[in-house]
Swiss-Prot record:
Binds 1 [4Fe-4S] cluster. It is a peripheral membrane protein. NDH shuttles electrons from NAD(P)H:plastoquinone, via FMN and iron-sulfur (Fe-S) centers, to quinones in the photosynthetic chain and possibly in a chloroplast respiratory chain. The immediate electron acceptor for the enzyme in this species is believed to be plastoquinone. Couples the redox reaction to proton translocation, and thus conserves the redox energy in a proton gradient. Transmembrane segments: none annotated. It is an enzyme of class 7 (translocase). GO terms for cellular component: chloroplast thylakoid membrane; respiratory chain complex I. It comes from Gossypium hirsutum. The keyword Ribosomal protein does not apply. This is NAD(P)H-quinone oxidoreductase subunit K, chloroplastic. Keywords: 4Fe-4S, Chloroplast, Iron, Iron-sulfur, Membrane, Metal-binding, NAD, NADP, Plastid, Plastoquinone, Quinone, Thylakoid, Translocase, Transport. GO terms for biological process: aerobic respiration; electron transport coupled proton transport; photosynthesis, light reaction. The lineage of its organism: Eukaryota, Viridiplantae, Streptophyta, Embryophyta, Tracheophyta. GO terms for molecular function: 4 iron, 4 sulfur cluster binding; iron ion binding; NADH dehydrogenase (ubiquinone) activity; quinone binding. Its cofactor is [4Fe-4S] cluster.
Amino acid sequence: MNSIEFPLLDRTTQNSVISTTLNDLSNWSRLSSLWPLLYGTSCCFIEFASLIGSRFDFDRYGLVPRSSPRQADLILTAGTVTMKMAPSLVRLYEQMPEPKYVIAMGACTITGGMFSTDSYSTVRGVDKLIPVDVYLPGCPPKPEAVIDAITKLRKKISREIYEDRIRSQQGDRCFTTNHKFCLVRSTRTGNYNQGLLYQPPSTSEIPPETFFNYKGSLSSHELVN
C-alpha cells in the first residue's frame, strides 16, 4: 500500500554506489518527510485527528504536524472556507517554503458543500485560492482515505519535476500572490461580479466589504464568490 517506485535509480553499480539525478534525489528526500500544516475548520478535521492515535499511526509516513507555515511543506485544508478566511489561508500558503503541497479534504473544501447553496460568503472550492495537488472527497472522509491521499501525494512527488510544478502553479491560481481577484467565468451562475480588488498588507486591516463589490441589488443566486 505504501510502496513507492523509483524507476530512474540505477542500483547495478558496483561498490554500493547509487547513481541518480539531483531531481530524483530531492523528490526521494521530501516524500518521506512531509511536515503538514493542519488547517481545519469543520467536522472533516475531526477525522484527521484520528490519524494521530495508535490505530493508524501516521508517524510511520514521516508526517510531523507543524504549527508554523514556515516549517511546513504540506497544508491540509479540511472544512468550509469563507471569504473572510480566504486572505488568511492564502497568506499561510505564501509563507510556506517551496516546494509546497496542498490536500483538499472533504466536500466543503472542494466545492463549498451544502453551505454554499445560498451563501454569499462561502468559497466554492479552495482551488480558487491556492493550487490543490490531491482532492479527497467525502463528508467527511475516513482516516483510511486520508492515508490513501497521502500515499498518492507521495507517489506524485516521486515523479514530479520541480520546474514544471512552478510553471503550473503560476498559471492555475485564481487568487494571486499579490492578493488580487482575477476575472474568470463562474461554472455555476455566469460571470463573477467582483472587479479587481486589492487588499492591504495586513489581513487584520481588511474590511469585510472588500470582498463584496456589488452594482445595484442582486438576488441571492447571483451572489457568487
